[in-house]
């Protein structure tokens, strides 16, 4: 008896080790060391002050959406996931803003979910297949499936991973209490559902999945429909789940003031189409597309919004054959649900978690691969169920069974290689956007993101090319039009810049960033009154637009209205303390006015929010040097040079400090370093070095006399 227990324990440990190993081979093994924040990570984490500000702003975390905007704002997508945001914030507080460790935690959560899935399937009662084989094969497929790459390798996929964990825990609770779902179990499941909804809204479907699982595990499907209905009406736990779900939904809507999100056409062209038939047919086709991505995850793309999926405009579109095929399978499953309950259970566990993303409510995407993380649990169950049913039906044909085993091993190998390849794409934005261009060459958003990244990398030729291509594919793409205008402005083509920014405003008149950028162009043209009017228009559409206040300050500076300039810069940093240019302008103005003590005090405030910003540190060092606090100034200059070692100005000013300090040899070395970096830019260093050497020469001559 003990030997059997030991063997079972050993077998269990081996199975779990294999599953974890598959996860690590697909996503880990040193592949995370060079990981960066990509795509949605930038908005939700890097630029989200709820995540990367200390001390913790609890009010903001529980009143803002996942992207850092107020939940009650008209611009908010209403994606309320405060516990996910809080997880990111805790990681930032403990370990800093590092994509590698955040993605590693995602990988650990994926390992945990894989093991929970294996444990869940082992505990099921499904008479037509071996649950032991069903468990290990389904969990292995779940571990290796490429559709999970976005959820695991994209940091914002944490919401899906936590939803998946809570979903599986609730299903395990349901199985453990089959036939005796009392108030304690029901209450715990509803509590976990409420917690899950604070990680991801789709967790509201958990009670429905639990009811589905309990229905099949209790064998209610054997009864006649009349008897089933009578029994289900008397199940207090099912009624409790229904009322609890409605209560959670009501509370969730109340928290956002019962306002619905508004999405642009670029986010979801299907939902914005004016024809009911086109919307309906296209939405049905998208359902099949999601299934196809799980069935054949070769073509994967980080954004399917513009140009990836053509709308289905009539019933004769051949793509609807896939829709007919899917509903045929569902119909066959319904007709055989008493004979093949495992298939029906797997199908239900695939469909139920997907309902919030299925088009029942308007969402801000066409297809989002990470939303398939939890539905893929049911898909993996269904796929392996079909394989085992086919395999077990071929008992007399050993060659065929051998061929099936080989095919299964090949499938797992291909899946693992594809997942590893896709995980590499998600390491940085350049690889990610390049991979998307191969899948969706006519996706305007892909071209837009490539252009944006090229601009950041200084490749303006490439940026111009892809911005123009994005606009060619989608002429009313307001963000692309505005950014192209900004690019022309940086190249001094102000008239062309104004033209494109005005086109952006024609496409979207309530676009605050476009109004602000129009103001910047008009200010550069000397049209100060028009620029001021544009800035005020931007503030009309976004009242707390910190960057706009900064640019208004610059406008007043150009008009020599110094008090108003200072006031607007101060207002900008009050709204958003992470604006280094605004802080630098404030400090420079105070320094120029001779208010060095005020400049030091303000620089301390600035460094609390931006401790490693070189512009603020540099100005503080200059002020300290003027006040003859040489030791402290020297330390800050050295820190600035450590952060940016190839900046001639920093070495020059360090030389000036030593010059004033009568540290002649150190001054000479600093000046020479500045000249060696860039002789053309080190004019001041050359002049100061020449003066210093001449002075030393004169002193030497005097000494000789």
From Swiss-Prot:
Its EC number is 2.4.1.109. This is Protein O-mannosyl-transferase Tmtc4. One of its GO terms (biological process) is protein O-linked mannosylation. Gene3D superfamilies: Tetratricopeptide repeat domain. It comes from Drosophila melanogaster (Fruit fly). It catalyses: a di-trans,poly-cis-dolichyl beta-D-mannosyl phosphate + L-seryl-[protein] = 3-O-(alpha-D-mannosyl)-L-seryl-[protein] + a di-trans,poly-cis-dolichyl phosphate + H(+); a di-trans,poly-cis-dolichyl beta-D-mannosyl phosphate + L-threonyl-[protein] = 3-O-(alpha-D-mannosyl)-L-threonyl-[protein] + a di-trans,poly-cis-dolichyl phosphate + H(+). Residues 39-91, 157-158, 207-235, 307-314, 368-370, 419-705 are extracellular. The keyword Glycoprotein applies. PROSITE patterns: TPR, TPR_REGION. SMART domains: TPR. It is found in: Membrane; Endoplasmic reticulum. Its main location: membrane. Belongs to the TMTC family. Transfers mannosyl residues to the hydroxyl group of serine or threonine residues. Keywords: Endoplasmic reticulum, Glycoprotein, Membrane, Repeat, TPR repeat, Transferase, Transmembrane, Transmembrane helix. Glycans are attached at residues 57, 459, 688. It comes from the Eukaryota. The chain crosses the membrane at residues 18-38, 92-112, 136-156, 159-179, 186-206, 236-256, 286-306, 315-335, 347-367, 371-391, 401-418. It is a multi-pass membrane protein. Residues 1-17, 113-135, 180-185, 257-285, 336-346, 392-400 are cytoplasmic.
